[in-house]
Regions:
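Short, small-residue-biased leader/transition segments that mark boundaries at the very start
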Residues: 1-6
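Domain-level signal for soluble alpha/beta catalytic cores
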Residues: 11-338
Protein backbone atom coordinates (compact mmCIF):
# COMPACT_ATOMS: atom_id res chain seq x y z
CA UNK A 1 0.00 0.00 0.00
CA UNK A 2 2.74 2.46 1.02
CA UNK A 3 4.86 1.58 -2.03
CA UNK A 4 1.87 2.15 -4.31
CA UNK A 5 1.27 5.53 -2.68
CA UNK A 6 4.93 6.52 -3.16
CA UNK A 7 4.82 5.37 -6.80
CA UNK A 8 1.57 7.27 -7.40
CA UNK A 9 3.11 10.42 -5.93
CA UNK A 10 6.16 10.06 -8.19
CA UNK A 11 3.84 9.81 -11.19
CA UNK A 12 1.92 12.85 -9.91
CA UNK A 13 5.08 14.90 -9.47
CA UNK A 14 6.06 14.28 -13.10
CA UNK A 15 2.81 15.99 -14.12
CA UNK A 16 3.64 19.25 -12.31
CA UNK A 17 2.37 21.82 -13.21
CA UNK A 18 -1.11 20.39 -13.63
CA UNK A 19 -3.69 21.26 -16.28
CA UNK A 20 -5.54 23.29 -13.67
CA UNK A 21 -3.56 24.76 -10.83
CA UNK A 22 -3.36 27.68 -8.44
CA UNK A 23 -0.56 29.92 -7.24
CA UNK A 24 -0.75 28.95 -3.58
CA UNK A 25 -1.73 31.94 -1.43
CA UNK A 26 -5.28 32.18 -0.08
CA UNK A 27 -7.32 34.79 1.77
CA UNK A 28 -6.91 34.40 5.53
CA UNK A 29 -10.02 33.16 7.34
CA UNK A 30 -11.47 35.47 10.00
CA UNK A 31 -10.47 33.25 12.92
CA UNK A 32 -6.85 33.31 11.75
CA UNK A 33 -6.84 37.10 11.40
CA UNK A 34 -8.36 37.40 14.87
CA UNK A 35 -5.77 35.01 16.33
CA UNK A 36 -2.91 36.90 14.73
CA UNK A 37 -4.23 40.21 16.09
CA UNK A 38 -4.59 38.63 19.56
CA UNK A 39 -1.01 37.34 19.31
CA UNK A 40 0.24 40.83 18.49
CA UNK A 41 -1.65 42.20 21.50
CA UNK A 42 0.00 39.58 23.71
CA UNK A 43 -3.26 37.73 24.38
CA UNK A 44 -2.10 34.53 22.62
CA UNK A 45 1.32 32.90 22.75
CA UNK A 46 3.17 31.38 19.79
CA UNK A 47 1.94 27.87 20.53
CA UNK A 48 -1.70 28.99 20.62
CA UNK A 49 -1.31 30.92 17.35
CA UNK A 50 0.26 27.87 15.70
CA UNK A 51 -2.68 25.76 16.84
CA UNK A 52 -5.10 28.11 15.04
CA UNK A 53 -2.84 28.14 11.96
CA UNK A 54 -2.75 24.33 11.95
CA UNK A 55 -6.53 24.17 12.16
CA UNK A 56 -7.04 26.70 9.34
CA UNK A 57 -4.47 25.01 7.09
CA UNK A 58 -6.04 21.58 7.68
CA UNK A 59 -9.43 23.01 6.66
CA UNK A 60 -7.93 24.73 3.60
CA UNK A 61 -6.23 21.55 2.36
CA UNK A 62 -9.55 19.69 2.70
CA UNK A 63 -11.20 22.39 0.56
CA UNK A 64 -8.44 22.18 -2.06
CA UNK A 65 -8.92 18.42 -2.31
CA UNK A 66 -12.71 18.77 -2.40
CA UNK A 67 -12.38 21.20 -5.33
CA UNK A 68 -10.45 18.53 -7.24
CA UNK A 69 -7.00 20.12 -7.27
CA UNK A 70 -3.89 17.94 -7.46
CA UNK A 71 -1.84 20.54 -5.59
CA UNK A 72 -2.12 21.36 -1.89
CA UNK A 73 -0.57 24.34 -0.07
CA UNK A 74 -0.83 25.95 3.34
CA UNK A 75 -2.25 29.11 1.76
CA UNK A 76 0.79 30.94 3.18
CA UNK A 77 -1.30 31.21 6.37
CA UNK A 78 1.74 31.31 8.67
CA UNK A 79 3.18 34.45 7.03
CA UNK A 80 2.74 38.15 7.62
CA UNK A 81 3.64 38.78 3.96
CA UNK A 82 4.17 36.52 0.97
CA UNK A 83 7.91 37.22 0.74
CA UNK A 84 9.45 39.04 3.69
CA UNK A 85 8.95 36.34 6.37
CA UNK A 86 11.19 34.10 4.28
CA UNK A 87 13.93 36.74 4.25
CA UNK A 88 13.59 37.48 7.98
CA UNK A 89 14.67 33.91 8.77
CA UNK A 90 18.05 34.44 7.05
CA UNK A 91 21.10 35.51 9.04
CA UNK A 92 21.97 39.15 8.39
CA UNK A 93 18.40 40.33 7.69
CA UNK A 94 16.43 42.63 9.99
CA UNK A 95 13.03 44.31 9.87
CA UNK A 96 11.11 47.04 11.66
CA UNK A 97 7.77 48.81 11.52
CA UNK A 98 7.54 50.99 8.43
CA UNK A 99 6.78 54.69 8.26
CA UNK A 100 6.30 54.82 4.50
CA UNK A 101 4.89 51.48 3.32
CA UNK A 102 5.02 49.86 -0.10
CA UNK A 103 3.15 51.64 -2.91
CA UNK A 104 0.28 49.75 -4.55
CA UNK A 105 -2.24 51.17 -7.01
CA UNK A 106 -4.29 53.56 -4.89
CA UNK A 107 -2.92 52.71 -1.44
CA UNK A 108 0.15 51.92 0.65
CA UNK A 109 0.82 48.45 2.07
CA UNK A 110 2.14 49.12 5.57
CA UNK A 111 4.47 46.11 5.75
CA UNK A 112 7.74 46.06 7.66
CA UNK A 113 10.87 47.68 6.26
CA UNK A 114 13.34 44.85 5.57
CA UNK A 115 17.09 45.38 5.32
CA UNK A 116 20.53 43.89 5.88
CA UNK A 117 22.12 43.85 9.33
CA UNK A 118 25.15 41.76 8.33
CA UNK A 119 26.31 39.08 5.92
CA UNK A 120 23.50 36.96 4.46
CA UNK A 121 23.37 33.27 5.30
CA UNK A 122 21.34 30.35 6.63
CA UNK A 123 22.97 28.76 9.67
CA UNK A 124 20.01 26.63 10.82
CA UNK A 125 16.96 24.92 9.35
CA UNK A 126 14.65 27.53 7.83
CA UNK A 127 11.16 27.68 9.46
CA UNK A 128 9.54 27.13 6.05
CA UNK A 129 10.87 23.56 6.08
CA UNK A 130 8.70 22.76 9.11
CA UNK A 131 5.81 24.60 7.47
CA UNK A 132 6.19 22.34 4.44
CA UNK A 133 6.30 19.17 6.55
CA UNK A 134 2.91 20.04 8.02
CA UNK A 135 1.34 20.18 4.52
CA UNK A 136 3.29 17.16 3.28
CA UNK A 137 1.45 14.90 5.74
CA UNK A 138 -1.79 15.50 3.80
CA UNK A 139 -0.42 14.24 0.46
CA UNK A 140 -2.22 11.25 -1.02
CA UNK A 141 -2.36 9.39 -4.34
CA UNK A 142 -4.09 12.38 -5.95
CA UNK A 143 -2.17 15.31 -4.52
CA UNK A 144 1.32 16.80 -4.27
CA UNK A 145 2.28 19.47 -1.73
CA UNK A 146 3.68 22.69 -3.18
CA UNK A 147 6.04 25.03 -1.34
CA UNK A 148 6.12 28.67 -2.41
CA UNK A 149 9.06 30.93 -1.59
CA UNK A 150 10.09 34.34 -2.91
CA UNK A 151 12.57 34.04 -5.77
CA UNK A 152 16.25 34.79 -5.13
CA UNK A 153 15.84 37.77 -7.48
CA UNK A 154 13.11 39.09 -5.19
CA UNK A 155 15.45 38.83 -2.19
CA UNK A 156 18.24 40.57 -4.12
CA UNK A 157 15.91 43.31 -5.37
CA UNK A 158 14.84 44.05 -1.80
CA UNK A 159 18.45 44.84 -0.92
CA UNK A 160 19.63 46.72 -4.04
CA UNK A 161 16.75 49.07 -4.85
CA UNK A 162 17.71 52.73 -4.34
CA UNK A 163 16.03 52.98 -0.92
CA UNK A 164 18.15 50.05 0.37
CA UNK A 165 21.43 50.49 -1.51
CA UNK A 166 23.17 52.73 1.04
CA UNK A 167 22.49 50.34 3.91
CA UNK A 168 23.46 47.27 1.86
CA UNK A 169 26.79 48.91 0.97
CA UNK A 170 27.74 48.76 4.67
CA UNK A 171 28.00 44.97 4.35
CA UNK A 172 28.68 44.36 0.65
CA UNK A 173 30.99 46.45 -1.50
CA UNK A 174 29.51 45.00 -4.70
CA UNK A 175 26.54 42.91 -5.80
CA UNK A 176 28.62 39.86 -6.73
CA UNK A 177 29.34 38.80 -3.16
CA UNK A 178 25.72 39.47 -2.18
CA UNK A 179 24.48 37.34 -5.10
CA UNK A 180 26.71 34.44 -4.01
CA UNK A 181 25.62 34.64 -0.36
CA UNK A 182 21.90 34.81 -1.18
CA UNK A 183 22.21 31.92 -3.65
CA UNK A 184 24.13 29.83 -1.11
CA UNK A 185 21.40 30.43 1.48
CA UNK A 186 18.74 29.37 -0.99
CA UNK A 187 20.67 26.23 -1.90
CA UNK A 188 20.60 25.16 1.76
CA UNK A 189 16.88 25.88 2.15
CA UNK A 190 16.06 24.05 -1.10
CA UNK A 191 18.19 21.06 -0.08
CA UNK A 192 16.42 20.93 3.29
CA UNK A 193 13.01 21.17 1.59
CA UNK A 194 13.98 18.35 -0.76
CA UNK A 195 15.09 16.21 2.19
CA UNK A 196 11.68 16.90 3.77
CA UNK A 197 10.00 15.48 0.66
CA UNK A 198 9.32 18.62 -1.38
CA UNK A 199 9.14 17.91 -5.11
CA UNK A 200 7.11 20.95 -6.15
CA UNK A 201 8.83 24.29 -5.54
CA UNK A 202 7.53 27.64 -6.75
CA UNK A 203 9.63 30.81 -6.85
CA UNK A 204 7.34 33.83 -6.54
CA UNK A 205 8.96 36.70 -8.38
CA UNK A 206 7.59 40.24 -8.54
CA UNK A 207 10.96 41.61 -9.66
CA UNK A 208 10.08 41.01 -13.34
CA UNK A 209 6.78 42.83 -12.86
CA UNK A 210 8.76 45.82 -11.60
CA UNK A 211 11.07 45.64 -14.63
CA UNK A 212 8.21 45.82 -17.16
CA UNK A 213 6.40 48.65 -15.38
CA UNK A 214 6.42 52.05 -17.17
CA UNK A 215 8.11 53.42 -14.02
CA UNK A 216 10.91 50.81 -14.08
CA UNK A 217 13.68 53.35 -14.72
CA UNK A 218 12.58 55.33 -11.69
CA UNK A 219 12.22 52.20 -9.52
CA UNK A 220 15.78 51.10 -10.26
CA UNK A 221 17.24 54.60 -10.80
CA UNK A 222 18.79 53.63 -14.14
CA UNK A 223 18.39 53.79 -17.95
CA UNK A 224 17.45 51.14 -20.55
CA UNK A 225 20.95 49.67 -20.58
CA UNK A 226 20.92 49.53 -16.78
CA UNK A 227 17.56 47.75 -16.76
CA UNK A 228 18.94 45.05 -19.06
CA UNK A 229 21.85 44.55 -16.67
CA UNK A 230 19.37 44.17 -13.80
CA UNK A 231 17.47 41.53 -15.81
CA UNK A 232 20.68 39.60 -16.38
CA UNK A 233 21.57 39.88 -12.69
CA UNK A 234 18.15 38.59 -11.65
CA UNK A 235 18.16 35.60 -14.00
CA UNK A 236 21.72 34.77 -12.93
CA UNK A 237 20.92 34.68 -9.21
CA UNK A 238 17.81 32.57 -9.84
CA UNK A 239 19.82 30.08 -11.91
CA UNK A 240 22.65 30.00 -9.39
CA UNK A 241 20.26 29.22 -6.53
CA UNK A 242 18.55 26.30 -8.32
CA UNK A 243 21.69 24.93 -9.95
CA UNK A 244 22.05 21.23 -9.15
CA UNK A 245 18.46 20.76 -7.95
CA UNK A 246 17.57 17.02 -8.19
CA UNK A 247 15.78 16.04 -11.40
CA UNK A 248 12.65 14.92 -9.58
CA UNK A 249 12.14 18.33 -7.97
CA UNK A 250 10.05 20.53 -10.25
CA UNK A 251 10.88 24.24 -10.01
CA UNK A 252 8.56 26.91 -11.38
CA UNK A 253 8.68 30.69 -11.47
CA UNK A 254 5.51 32.63 -10.76
CA UNK A 255 5.76 36.14 -12.20
CA UNK A 256 3.51 38.42 -10.19
CA UNK A 257 2.62 42.11 -10.22
CA UNK A 258 1.50 42.17 -6.61
CA UNK A 259 -1.88 41.74 -4.95
CA UNK A 260 -2.78 43.73 -1.86
CA UNK A 261 -6.46 44.34 -1.04
CA UNK A 262 -7.14 43.24 -4.65
CA UNK A 263 -4.98 45.97 -6.12
CA UNK A 264 -1.56 45.75 -7.78
CA UNK A 265 1.97 47.07 -7.44
CA UNK A 266 3.09 47.13 -11.09
CA UNK A 267 1.81 46.93 -14.67
CA UNK A 268 3.25 46.04 -18.04
CA UNK A 269 3.46 43.36 -20.73
CA UNK A 270 6.19 40.69 -20.72
CA UNK A 271 7.77 41.93 -23.97
CA UNK A 272 10.76 43.72 -22.44
CA UNK A 273 11.82 40.78 -20.23
CA UNK A 274 10.75 37.82 -22.38
CA UNK A 275 14.11 37.18 -24.03
CA UNK A 276 16.06 37.03 -20.75
CA UNK A 277 13.39 35.52 -18.49
CA UNK A 278 11.91 32.92 -20.85
CA UNK A 279 15.06 31.95 -22.75
CA UNK A 280 17.66 32.03 -19.98
CA UNK A 281 15.98 30.99 -16.72
CA UNK A 282 16.51 27.28 -15.99
CA UNK A 283 13.12 26.44 -14.52
CA UNK A 284 10.62 23.74 -15.49
CA UNK A 285 7.61 26.03 -15.78
CA UNK A 286 6.23 29.56 -15.53
CA UNK A 287 3.05 30.72 -13.85
CA UNK A 288 2.18 33.93 -15.70
CA UNK A 289 -0.51 36.52 -15.03
CA UNK A 290 -2.72 37.24 -18.02
CA UNK A 291 -5.85 38.18 -16.09
CA UNK A 292 -6.34 41.69 -17.47
CA UNK A 293 -5.06 44.21 -20.02
CA UNK A 294 -2.14 45.19 -17.74
CA UNK A 295 -0.42 41.93 -18.70
CA UNK A 296 -0.34 42.53 -22.45
CA UNK A 297 -0.70 39.90 -25.18
CA UNK A 298 0.57 36.34 -25.49
CA UNK A 299 3.25 37.11 -28.12
CA UNK A 300 6.16 37.03 -25.60
CA UNK A 301 5.42 33.33 -24.99
CA UNK A 302 7.22 32.63 -28.27
CA UNK A 303 10.46 33.05 -26.26
CA UNK A 304 9.65 30.16 -23.89
CA UNK A 305 12.18 27.54 -24.95
CA UNK A 306 13.00 23.87 -24.40
CA UNK A 307 10.51 21.69 -22.54
CA UNK A 308 9.32 24.46 -20.24
CA UNK A 309 5.61 24.60 -19.52
CA UNK A 310 3.43 27.67 -19.05
CA UNK A 311 0.48 28.01 -16.70
CA UNK A 312 -1.80 30.77 -17.94
CA UNK A 313 -3.18 32.96 -15.16
CA UNK A 314 -6.52 33.72 -16.80
CA UNK A 315 -8.78 33.62 -13.74
CA UNK A 316 -8.36 36.75 -11.63
CA UNK A 317 -8.61 36.96 -7.85
CA UNK A 318 -8.84 40.75 -7.94
CA UNK A 319 -12.58 40.93 -8.64
CA UNK A 320 -15.49 38.66 -7.70
CA UNK A 321 -17.13 38.31 -11.13
CA UNK A 322 -16.56 34.89 -12.69
CA UNK A 323 -14.92 34.86 -16.12
CA UNK A 324 -16.90 33.76 -19.17
CA UNK A 325 -16.02 30.12 -19.87
CA UNK A 326 -15.93 30.48 -23.66
CA UNK A 327 -13.78 33.61 -23.42
CA UNK A 328 -11.26 31.72 -21.27
CA UNK A 329 -11.20 28.82 -23.75
CA UNK A 330 -10.64 31.28 -26.61
CA UNK A 331 -7.71 32.86 -24.76
CA UNK A 332 -6.12 29.43 -24.21
CA UNK A 333 -6.31 28.77 -27.96
CA UNK A 334 -4.84 32.22 -28.62
CA UNK A 335 -1.91 31.56 -26.26
CA UNK A 336 -1.29 28.15 -27.87
CA UNK A 337 -0.31 29.90 -31.13
CA UNK A 338 2.95 30.98 -29.51
Amino acid sequence: QRQMCIRDRKIMSRNIPFRYDFVGSFLRPEKLKEARAAFQRGELDGKQLKSVEDECITELVAEQKKAGYHVITDGEFRRATWHLDFMWAFDGVGHSKTNTGLPFHGEQAMIDDTYLTGKVGVSSVHPFVEHFKFVKQFEDENTVAKQTIPAPAQFLEQMILPFAAENTAKYYSDNEELVKDIAAGYKKVIADLYAAGCRNLQLDDCSWGMLVDPMAKMFFDTDDEGLLKVQELFVRINNLAIEGVPEDMMVATHVCRGNFHSTYASSGAYNDVAKVLFEQENVDAYYLEFDDERSGGFEPLAHVNGDKKVVLGLITTKKPELEDKQAVIARIHEAAKY
